[in-house]
C-alpha cells in the first residue's frame, strides 16, 4: 500500500471471500480493513515502461524487535524472554532468490524474571537468579505468490486433506457459507498432452514434484529416503500422471543451488535428538496451492524406529533382536517414515480410520497380506503387523485358564 510518499505493510487476511463481479464484494471489502503493521518512507520511485518500482529501507525494521521478523509475545512467554538487547542483536545474512528472500538474524533477549510459561516455569528458581541473556538465531522467509492463483478445489470432509478455511458471501444470498480449499500441488498436463490426458492416457506433468535430499544426509540413508518419495508415483498414476514425483540427490556441482531457494523442495537432515520427523508445506492462502516443502528429518528418529520395530516385530523377526539393526532393515524403516512424511507434504492428513477397515483375521492371512498389505493407508499409524504372531491361545494362556 502506497500513501503520501509512504509504503505501508498490511497483515493480509484471506478469511472472507466474495467475487469482485458480485454485489457483496464492495461491502465485504469495506468491512475487512487489513491492519497496517509498518510504514516506510519511499526512498525513490522509478518508472520502467508500464512498471513502477518503489525503493524503501527496511534495515532498522528487520533488526528491531517486532512480530514480523522476531518472536511473538506468546513465544517470548514460552521461552522466558523479555526485552531485546539491541547491541547484541544484528542481521547476519540476507539472500535473494528468484522467488524468495531469506533473512537470518541473531537476537538476544533479557530473561524474564521467573522464567516462561513452558519448561522455564519449572526452572523458575534458576531464572530468578540468572542474568545470562538468551540468544537465538532466526530465519525469516518472504515468498512471492503466483501472479495467477491456481484454481482451487473445495474440501470434502470424507477425504483427508489439509484445507484452508474461509467465509463465502456469494453462494448463499441470504447468509454466509463456510468453505475450505484443500492444499495440493499444481499438477497439470503439458499443453501437447492435454488431449491424451483427457482420454485417460498416462502423461507426464508440466512441472513434476521434485524433492531433493539434503547434501548433509549420511550417504547410506539417501537411497531409502529417495525410495520413500518415489513410492508415491503409483498413486499419481491413478490420477493420470506418470513420473509426477521423484526424489533426487541435491546437485554438488552447481554453486547456485541452495536449500534456501524456494524453488527447491527437500528432505532436510537435522542432527537433533528429537525422535521424530515432520512434513510441513508452504501453500498459497488464496488457493491452497502447495508451493514448496522442507521435510524435517531428525537424526534421532531412528531410535524411535528401533523401539517401534523391536517391540512390534521382535517376536517374529530375528533381525529385530539386535542391539543395533542392520543398515538394510533400518533403511527400510527410514523409507517407511519418509513415505509417510511425503504424504503430509502432498496435503494429506493422518488417516487413523483406515486400519479399522481390516479385520484381524485378514491380518493373519499370509496370502491376503501379501496381496493387500496390513493397512490401507501409509498415513495411518498402523506401524507393523504384530497380529501375525498370536493366531491361537499361547501356552501361557492355556496354563492361566486352568
Positions of PLM-derived features:
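Auxiliary tRNA-acceptor-end handling modules of aminoacyl-tRNA synthetases
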Residues: 1-6, 10-217, 235, 250-305, ...
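Conserved small/polar residues in nucleotide/adenosyl-binding loops
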Residues: 4-12, 390-399
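Stable alpha-helical elements in mature extracytoplasmic
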Residues: 221-228, 330, 334, 338
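Active-site recognition of the HExxH zinc-binding catalytic motif
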Residues: 336-348
